[in-house]
UniProtKB/Swiss-Prot annotation:
Catalytic subunit of the molybdopterin synthase complex, a complex that catalyzes the conversion of precursor Z into molybdopterin. Acts by mediating the incorporation of 2 sulfur atoms from thiocarboxylated Mocs2A into precursor Z to generate a dithiolene group. Heterotetramer; composed of 2 small (Mocs2A) and 2 large (Mocs2B) subunits. The keyword Transferase applies. This protein is produced by a bicistronic gene which also produces the small subunit (Mocs2A). CDD domains: MoaE. Belongs to the MoaE family. MOCS2B subfamily. Its main location: cytoplasm. Disulfide bonds: none annotated. Substrate binds at residues 101-102, 117, 124-126. This is Molybdopterin synthase catalytic subunit. It comes from the Eukaryota.
Amino acid sequence: MDHVKLVGDPIDISHIHELLLDDGCGASSVFVGTTRDNFQGKKVVSLAYEAYDNMAIKEMNKICSDLRSKWPGLKHIVIHHRLGTVPVREASVVIAASSPHRSEALESVSFAIDQLKTRVPIWKKEIYEGDHEAEWKENKESIRAKQSLSSFNYSACPCQVEESHEVPQKLVQIRVNDAELSKRLECFVNRKRDEINSQNIIDFKHPPADSVPELSDSCARTQSTVIKQEKSNCHIKVRRVNNRSFPQQMELRPNYELELNKLMGSRDGQNEPSVKMRKSLYDSRLLTIESYMGLAPKSEDDIFSRIKTLEDRILLLESISPEYKHFTNIEPSSLEPPAPKKTRKKSYSAHELGMLIEKIKNE
C-alpha cells in the first residue's frame, strides 16, 4: 500500500514503522532527512519548506508507481514530507519501504529520495542566525532549466500577511516584488511598441534605393510616405462589392435592345411598322425620354438607336447617382408650353363710358 502525505506537524517515526509492518515482509528500509545546524560556516536556525500541494502529491504518487514497476516485490511504501518551519534536529522528510528481501527495500528507498529531490515541486529556505539574510536553496538534482530557476527570485519576495487575513500558499502564483513586476510590464510594453513600429515602417515607408543610404534614426512618423494601392487613391486596400440588386447590379436588368427588337424589329416586308405605329412609338417613348433628359428631338433617322442611347444614359446615371435628376440644368417642366395668364377685365363706370364716347366723337 502507498502512504503519501504532506504534513505541517512533526513526523512521527513510530507511526511510520507501524505502516510498514506486514507478516510477509522480512526487511524494512527507512530514510529520515533532518535539519542540520550549519551551512558554509553560517549557523542555521531552521528550514522553511513550501510546496505546490496538488502537483507535489501527484508526483509523489508517480514515484510510488515507478518503484513498484522496478521492484514488484515491494509491499508498503511511505513518503511523508513536512511543510512550514522545521527546526534543527527535526525530520523534514521520511521515505520508507518494506519487502520480503532487504535488497529491494534498500535500493527502492535510495531511488525514491533521488526522484523526490528531482521531480517534486518543494522549495526550501534556510534561515540563519544573526544578520545573515535567509536564502532559498535549489536542489542540485532538479531537472528544471537553470534559466527558469534564475528568473524566479524568491529572496526578493517579502510576504507580510496579517494572521487574520492569511492566504493559502497554493493560491499565490506571482511571488515577485513591485520592482520586478514593473520591470516585466515595461519589457512587455516595449516589445509591443517595437512590433507596431516595425509594421508602420512596412506600411508607410518606401524601401531605400541603392543610391540612397538608409538613415539610422529614421522612422515612419517623420518620413512617412503614402504608398497608393493599385487603382486606388489611398494606401488602404479597397475591395469591389458586387451588389445582388439595385442599380449597380446591371446583369439583373432587362435587355432593352432585345426587347425593342422583338417589338419593333422588321420581320417581313408586310409586317413593317406603319406610319401611325411609328408616330405612336415616337410619342410614347422617344419624346418622353428626350424630354426627361432635357433634349429636343432633331431628326427621325435611326430612331431605335436613339432610344437605345437614351436608355443607356439613364441606366448609367442611375448606377452612378440615383439623385441625378435634382442636378440637371433643364427641368422637364420647362419644356411644357407656358399656361396663358389670366387677366381680369377692367370694369368701367357710367361716367367713364360717357367720357370715352365723347372722346371718340371729337376725334
